[in-house]
Swiss-Prot record:
The keyword RNA-binding does not apply. The active site is at residues 86, 224, 657. Optimum temperature is approximately 30 degrees Celsius for the hydrolysis of Gly-Phe-pNA. Stable at a temperature below 20 degrees Celsius for 30 minutes. This is Dipeptidyl aminopeptidase BII.
Amino acid sequence: MRPNLLAAAIAVPLSLLAAQIAQAGEGMWVPQQLPEIAGPLKKAGLKLSPQQISDLTGDPMGAVVALGGCTASFVSPNGLVVTNHHCAYGAIQLNSTAENNLIKNGFNAPTTADEVSAGPNARVFVLDEITDVTKDAKAAIAAAGDDALARTKALEAFEKKLIADCEAEAGFRCRLYSFSGGNTYRLFKNLEIKDVRLAYAPPGSVGKFGGDIDNWMWPRHTGDFAFYRAYVGKDGKPAAFSKDNVPYQPKHWLKFADQPLGAGDFVMVAGYPGSTNRYALAAEFDNTAQWTYPTIARHYKNQIAMVEAAGKQNADIQVKYAATMAGWNNTSKNYDGQLEGFKRIDAAGQKLREEAAVLGWLKGQGAKGQPALDAHAKLLDLLEQSKATRDRDLTLALFNNTAMLGSATQLYRLSIEREKPNAERESGYQERDLPAIEGGLKQLERRYVAAMDRQLQEYWLNEYIKLPADQRVAAVDAWLGGNDAAAVKRALDRLAGTKLGSTEERLKWFAADRKAFEASNDPAIQYAVAVMPTLLKLEQERKTRAGENLAARPVYLQALADYKKSQGEFVYPDANLSLRITFGNVMGYAPKDGMEYTPFTTLEGVVAKETGQDPFDSPKALLDAVAAKRYGGLEDKRIGSVPVNYLSDLDITGGNSGSPVLDAHGKLVGLAFDGNWESVSSNWVFDPKMTRMIAVDGRYLRWIMQEVYPAPQLLKEMNVGK
């Protein structure tokens, strides 16, 4: 999920880092900063040189890859990639049927010939180069003058040209990242591997043990890991899926640690964290806490209940909506945890006090501080503008995101954009984007059931007719033809006649021109044609606000950074899906008075949670192996068993899932897959006492592959077999 560049995560300029007081735990450091914080890294226990881990194409960093929403790493010279089970969940679900349910049973390819495609849109991105383009980006924006919409379009044009030049070399995918709300811009160039195959996934009763009950919780006992393999053409260059392709040979791959990890040991994570908001305005925080999180969580829970009920009657729904449900569950529980955490640490009060101090400092500077004060006022005004239509915007977006309407609106928009020169098309509809659009159309039926889609459409139409008059959309009202349950039923009955449920039909429209859409009698396409002018108008309004933000946000954030520097504080960029490193130590925590959590869980803890019912229904092979104390030489004598999961004080967020956890020597000791319940609010206000990362221990991964769901071929490939 790609965040809008123009609303990229708020951060502070890296040049203002006060490295001398940086410490382990808090901080998502860009690799270029690592030599500056060499002291804290060494103090925490790093044995490698900071210069070595800041070499992004060397060992070990060159082994870390992005999946587009998750992180992974190469673990063999033959293109084997390890990530989280939940990151591979979509691929597992895509290859599952009610009769052959890989989600439940697992997948273990005996040979590379038996590996299956992870889907047409599965990707492995291997970082090749990072270039600072701040000067050119700012010049392009400045040339647009005072017109807000022109500023947005100027940045878009700059980005498109920059990316087109970067991607002139075949096989690469490039992306422009904004830091500090527009104070810094960097271009990332990645090798784009397009043939990704599922090699191994443990049964769901291992990979998702504890399910949504244990999600975000400690103690934890989840084997959250899976393996892909990256393939390329025989010439070694990226190519679409083909039986003739061969495994990719990375320059670097991670080796499993040969020293046992213990409490207090140094660990670090390299990955692609999605978004944090630690430098957001207090009012922006308040809007999120009071409306955004509660509202989205409520809608997701309602939809979860709908799909669960339907799934009990239809196994096809249960399988096809598994990945969607996992996402809804994860997000809604995360938001609940953040809201609880906000209250526990008085996040609202902290944000208000911090902002009051900054504003007071600026006022004390007289004329020098006025531009930042004006920028702050402008940001508040922009927030109020967005709040005025937030219910409409959310409802319309999620209604249009249901399967058939999502396909119809995307396809019609594509036909409109195709009338323009490629450089002038909206991002997401350029020639570079067509394979992803086509891939999504091809795999939609594996995640769609008509009866379920109708229920979801009905849910959002019922939400729409509840909107106040000033938030209604004339085009939708005209299409709906009423404001009651009868009108909703008529609309649903019309939409049921769409033919877009067929892959063949969707691909036909993928190649159609605009006139064909506007002459169509398909009800989903007719809806898209009816509402598109309004959608385009609303998009222009958002871009105008984004242009205002481009002028105000960097000014205020620069002032915020200056204030922090004056107070002797260190600063680091908010997460924005770019490569980051976080470091710290293995340690437990005390969630409540009189309660102390140790940092490791064990095999015996898995058995203690066993109920025989989902989600605590371990495979018989696991229970038998634990009962026989068949540890396979992987036990840690300090805890008397094989460690399953462990805690550390590292700073991660969504997007870090699947990130390799490295020890002091750069060896693999596990995979990041979650945070504890008390940590989720740290996306906004970091709490060092409570924030902990949860990782699956590398020894548990190996134990499962050795004793429970054997994959000797992969263990041998990773040079860790018996």
